[in-house]
UniProtKB/Swiss-Prot annotation:
Single GO term (MF): aconitate decarboxylase activity
Similarity annotation: Belongs to the PrpD family.
Domain of life: Eukaryota
Keyword field contains Mitochondrion: yes
Applied biotechnology: A.terreus has been used for the industrial production of itaconic acid because of its high production rate. Itaconic acid is used as a monomer to form polymers that are widely used as raw materials for latex, synthetic resins, adhesives, paint, and additives for acrylic resin fibers and paper. It is also used as an acidulant and for the pH adjustment of foods.
Name this protein carries in UniProt: Cis-aconitate decarboxylase
Species name: Aspergillus terreus
Length: 490
């Protein structure tokens, strides 16, 4: 028997193993602190969806989508409208990713909530149309399946390697995470879960050139949510796909997305199932406090630390004394964000992906929030920001590549006209060295949600999500999320 035919007849492997785990996962298998943490990650995703729903690029996406998509049964967050499941999932995902404030994983970069929540919410409304009631614990279990599977599959292909090579990695290995989360919500058997995974994986894609302009980068995790949801729904209807899609030697997911990476071995399929049930990636999903790429949070925090230490030296009135800013980054961060904008005006997304521009706005405004990247009132044309951005250079430091949790590290050196300099290093920014406390996530939720809706609705959503494990029907939650919100930028 040839190797290829043996492979094609394989009945077990990591695909089968993770599908069995996902299909059979029960609340009794999950530590109570993991169940609790999942609720806060869901709350953070909801806050990001609300604050991202009415920014200009999200409104443009909704207008375009509504022009060709018919109404459906699935709610669009913040709009009071409904679409079909696939369209609703993509739209809601675009909202969560819209402001670069949503979660990320520091070892296998992806934005979990933007994949898992839109797919799971849409799948639940499909079942509701069929007369089935979805409980809060159903949603938590499905979310945890997504939170746990995405980083594992990403680590199997060396996490940020795809990003270094120009792929939008989260849009790639987010697809199987979306399929597993959807499959869990739909109650798929392990066999059908493999079908869902196969359908999702054969669609996986995303190009990182999207960071240089336009709007499409905002919805590329939506492609993963769409692919996962579509895979789950088709499998739920009996549609079949290839089995063993992750590990197949010919045309398999792990093999195809690691070709030419120069690694030995090219991929580590054991990572797909490493520590299942004992190590919980739900606690390694990082919460953002800055509205920019998570890989440069270390340098931003370093600048913030220097501003606290040298308030007079880095006072806005004295920034013209800066001669040069150099930042050392991990390979992934430098590949992704270590570029200087060449064209003006810069787009919002490009500003949020350029370490030069990001550090310049932190120096000028002493904060790095959504308002720093607003396209209103020539905000992205400010001369003082551009003057500093052109003084920023970056290089990669192999030191930061040794630990997967240091991918967002940074060492910043600021040189002044008089020849003096100051330096600060942050290897693991806030939320990476230790998980962000739940209380800090709640504060972020209240701040973001409170900027786009009234206090009573903020409290209602908070109570429903933090009591999700006791909620017998999630319809009231989805109905509240559907209520129109305002733009955070006006």
């Amino acid at each position: 028997m040839t190797k290829q035919s043996a492979d094609s007849n394989a009945k077990s492997g990591v695909t089968s193993e993770i599908c069995h785990w996902a299909s059979n996962l029960a609340t009794d298998d999950i530590p109570s602190d993991v169940l609790e943490r999942a609720k806060y990650l869901i709350l953070d995703g909801i806050a990001c969806a609300w604050v991202g729903a009415r920014v200009p690029w999200s409104e443009k996406y909704v207008q375009a989508t509504m022009s060709f998509e018919p109404p459906g049964a699935c709610r669009v967050i913040g709009y009071g409208q409904k679409l079909g499941p696939v369209a609703a999932a993509m739209t809601n995902s675009a909202f969560i990713q819209a402001t670069e404030l949503d979660d990320y994983h520091s070892e296998a970069p992806l934005h979990s909530a933007s994949i898992v929540l839109p797919a799971v919410f849409a799948a639940s409304e499909v079942l509701a149309e069929q007369g089935k009631t979805i409980s809060g614990i159903d949603v938590i279990l499905a979310a945890i399946v997504g939170f746990e599977s995405g980083p594992r599959i990403g680590k199997a292909i060396y996490g940020s390697d795809l990003l270094n090579n120009g792929w939008h990695c989260g849009a790639v290995y987010g697809a199987p995470a979306g399929a597993l989360a959807t499959g869990k919500l739909l109650g798929l058997t392990p066999d059908s879960m493999e079908d869902a995974l196969g359908i999702a994986c054969t669609q996986a894609c995303g190009l990182m050139s999207a960071q240089y302009g336009g709007m499409v980068k905002r919805v590329q995790h939506g492609f993963a949510a769409r692919n996962g949801l579509l895979g789950g729904l088709l499998a739920h209807g009996g549609y079949e796909a290839m089995k063993g899609v992750l590990e197949r030697s010919y045309g398999g997911f792990l093999k195809m997305f690691t070709k030419g990476n120069g690694r030995e071995p090219p991929y580590k399929e054991e990572e797909v199932v490493a520590g299942l049930g004992s190590f919980w990636h739900t606690f390694t999903i990082r919460i953002k406090l800055y509205a920019c790429c998570g890989l440069v949070h270390g340098p931003v925090e370093a600048i913030e630390n220097l501003q606290g230490r040298y308030p007079e030296l880095l006072n806005r009135a004295n920034l013209s004394n800066i001669r040069h800013v150099h930042v050392q980054l991990s390979t992934a961060s430098n590949s992704h964000c270590g570029w200087i904008p060449e064209e003006r005006p810069i787009s919002s997304i490009a500003g949020q992906m350029s370490v030069a521009y990001i550090l310049a706005v932190q120096l000028v405004d002493q904060q790095c929030l959504l308002s720093q990247f607003s396209e209103f009132d020539d905000n992205l044309e400010r001369p003082e920001v551009w003057d500093l951005a052109r003084k920023v250079t970056s290089s990669q430091s192999e030191e930061f590549d040794q630990d997967g949790n240091c991918l967002s590290a940074g060492r910043v050196r600021i040189e002044f006209n008089d020849g003096s300099s100051i330096t600060e290093s942050v290897e693991k920014p806030l939320g990476v060295k230790e998980p962000m406390p739940n209380e800090r996530i709640l504060h972020k939720y209240r701040t973001l949600a409170g900027s786009v809706t009234d206090e009573s609705r903020v409290k209602e959503i908070e109570d429903l999500v933090l009591g999700l494990d006791r909620l017998t029907d999630i319809s009231p939650l989805l109905e509240l999320l559907n209520c129109p919100v305002k733009s955070p930028l006006v």
